[in-house]
């Protein structure tokens, strides 16, 4: 008889469609479901991100490879799974690509210039430092993070290559807090073009994300860029088709969730 049919990744799939897959909405360790990022190739199951156990993400890709779409899909997942009291977004968007994509009650700041990023980050870091646990915090409080109340903050950065310039990086003030993200309720998600990525991974903030074992995502790119994440080189691919490098799950291919522009 005919051989088994190869089940292939879709070329376009929405988070709503992925949510229908078995286990896509299963709670993680008794807590809320993880955020749906896409579909994994190996088992054609949901590729998920649990913000309780992982804090940050970074992604590289050529233009039109799906970076902005990924950030838009992620923002919509955050909004779908949280109240505005639970999650607030700070969006750094030099090209204004995501203007209007996030309901204003979830939007703490929408920053389009490096000057506004530098100014707001200084205030934001001062605010987050107030959340750092003091000497009087008990082990129980540490376990359930009950010594402060308020939303988790998601800093979503598009076109990171336009944000980091020869003058410096207006996000540098966040770097010392990245390792304590769980204590202060911080998530940093960076999207950058693939050109020059193999050098960009030595920039301080991005290097911190990598050193902390954050999940990295590579969309379409020129293989000549060389090894970008670990030993993995980019490949030319369809929009949204990704190579994911995860500390927990290893390296796998995925199709990232599509979401329509505003």
Residue ranges of predicted features:
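Phosphate-binding and hydrolysis-coupling loops of NTP-dependent motor/remodeling domains
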Residues: 1-41, 46-48, 191, 198-262
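P-loop NTPase catalytic phosphate-binding loop
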Residues: 27-140, 144-214, 221
